[in-house]
């Protein structure tokens, strides 16, 4: 049986599932709070006007691409810190936790600089009315100011989760969501002496909230009793560039994997623009709902990177392989439930997004594609998380590039926009390619995880393969 789960008792599997769920659930709530923040931005900007909504959508696409890519790089801290804890090297843990804070701040500063540098070419590329373009740039500037804090927060996220205390992340994320709503309103409408920014105020609210996130979580972990034995500021020293290089060696492939995935959906949105507003609106609606479901396997994947990292760091590769298998079972079970939910509630789901019968009709069809790829999407996400726990990131990056850019984007363009293979399929061609790309990624990453975990187990036992 895959990952030799047949050798474990039902009680052992359930006990490990509870351990994973204990880590995953608070992180899932935190991720939902973050998605809800973006949802609030969209709704509040839309209330101001169409131009403001367009500005927020375009500005957010730039911000999210940079944010997700850098978040992937900082995610290297999860397995690094977990390995130190597994090997009981508290000194190395304290050192890298503190250096990770510097690393996040500096990486975020580079990301902020990149976003600001992109403003000039974006003004040239965006063929929009000048007032809309100005709002896009104002949004990007505000969001960029928060980028150093955003990456420092991700470093603190890795620190807290590796110690097995993700509730701190959840509490701060919920507080940030509560703060974002009044901040949006104040900056959009120019209350209390603040300039009236319209929808662009959401970008500045985002930047401010990221600083709140960072400082609040830093305060929490600095004073709460759960972190008494590993105070992050106690190990703070001058930036160590050798440690930064070690973080980058592991983190850059993760960041590229994240970039490949997020850019796939960004490029598809741009490519289907010529198919009309109904197609674009339907695609974005179905994608938004799929992203919400994606929080389930993603939270399990983050928990696995910690749990697998702990045991791999301790040299207990049998436990690491077993945990990977339990996580995969959990993810596939949740994906099966999500698939059933989507299939049964396709029309009500689309009614939440639009009353336009054309959007609903097309959306109910696209949701069939979304239902089909739930299992393989969960498999590729969870396998990636477990592999990060083993500090294996280069091969997953290559698999993601091949799956998403070749099988996903390349095949999608051929099926959706040309007659080269079959008569032009339009939006359905892109979603067919999405299903194929996620299936390829899911199968390859699951195979690689099974093979890599088996090799480490046998090597640990002195067995030559």
UniProtKB/Swiss-Prot annotation:
Transmembrane segments: 21-43, 58-80, 100-122, 137-156, 169-191, 201-223, 250-272, 287-309, 322-344, 359-376, 395-417, 427-449
Pfam families, per the entry: MatE (PF01554)
Coiled coil: none
Keyword Lipid metabolism listed: no
Gene Ontology biological-process entries: monoatomic ion transport
Keywords: Antiport, Cell inner membrane, Cell membrane, Ion transport, Membrane, Transmembrane, Transmembrane helix, Transport
KW Nucleotide-binding (keyword) present: no
Location in or out of the cell: Cell inner membrane
Signal peptide limits: none
CDD domains on file: MATE_NorM_like (cd13131)
InterPro entries noted in UniProt: MATE_fam (IPR002528), MATE_MdtK (IPR050222), MdtK-like (IPR048279)
UniProt-recorded name of the protein: Probable multidrug resistance protein NorM
Native source species: Chromobacterium violaceum (strain ATCC 12472 / DSM 30191 / JCM 1249 / CCUG 213 / NBRC 12614 / NCIMB 9131 / NCTC 9757 / MK)
Gene that specifies this protein: norM
């Amino acid at each position: 049986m895959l990952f030799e789960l047949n050798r474990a008792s039902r009680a052992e599997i359930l006990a490990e599932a509870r351990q994973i769920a204990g880590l995953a659930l608070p992180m899932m709530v935190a991720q939902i709070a973050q998605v809800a923040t973006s949802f609030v931005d969209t709704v509040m900007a839309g209330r101001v006007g169409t131009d403001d909504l367009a500005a927020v959508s375009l500005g957010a696409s730039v911000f999210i691409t940079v944010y997700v890519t850098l978040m992937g790089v900082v995610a290297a801290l999860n397995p690094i810190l977990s390995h130190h804890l597994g090997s009981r090297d508290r000194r190395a843990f304290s050192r890298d936790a503190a250096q990770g804070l510097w690393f996040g701040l500096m990486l975020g500063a580079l990301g902020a600089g990149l976003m600001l540098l992109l403003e000039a070419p974006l003004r040239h590329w965006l063929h929009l009315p000048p007032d809309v373009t100005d709002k896009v740039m104002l949004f990007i500037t505000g969001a960029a100011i928060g980028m150093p804090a955003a990456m420092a927060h991700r470093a603190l996220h890795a620190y807290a989760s590796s110690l097995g205390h993700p509730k701190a992340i959840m509490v701060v994320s919920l507080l940030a969501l509560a703060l974002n709503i009044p901040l949006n309103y104040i900056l959009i409408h120019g209350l209390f002496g603040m300039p009236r920014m319209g929808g662009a105020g959401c970008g500045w609210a985002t930047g401010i909230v990221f600083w709140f996130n960072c400082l609040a979580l830093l305060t929490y972990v600095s004073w709460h009793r759960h972190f008494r034995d590993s105070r992050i500021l106690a190990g703070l020293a001058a930036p160590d560039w050798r440690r930064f290089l070690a973080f980058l060696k592991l983190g850059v492939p993760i960041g590229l994997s994240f970039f490949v995935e997020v850019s796939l959906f960004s490029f598809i949105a741009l490519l289907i623009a010529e198919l009309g507003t109904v197609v674009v609106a339907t695609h974005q609606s179905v994608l938004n709902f799929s992203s919400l479901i994606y929080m389930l396997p993603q939270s399990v994947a983050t928990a696995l990177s910690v749990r697998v990292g702990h045991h791999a760091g301790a040299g207990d590769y049998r436990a690491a392989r077993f945990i990977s298998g339990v996580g995969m079972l959990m993810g596939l079970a949740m994906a099966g439930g999500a698939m059933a939910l989507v299939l049964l509630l396709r029309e009500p789901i689309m009614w939440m997004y639009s009353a336009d019968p054309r959007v609903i009709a097309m959306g109910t069809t696209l949701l069939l594609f979304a239902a089909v790829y739930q299992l393989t999407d969960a498999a590729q996400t969870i396998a990636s998380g477990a592999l990060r726990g083993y500090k294996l990131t280069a091969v997953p990056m290559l698999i993601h590039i091949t799956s998403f850019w070749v099988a996903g984007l390349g095949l999608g363009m051929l099926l959706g926009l040309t007659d080269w293979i079959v008569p032009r399929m339009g939006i359905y061609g892109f979603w067919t390619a999405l299903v194929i790309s996620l299936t390829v990624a899911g199968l390859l990453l699951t195979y690689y995880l099974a093979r890599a975990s088996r090799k480490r187990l046998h090597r640990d036992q002195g067995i030559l393969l």
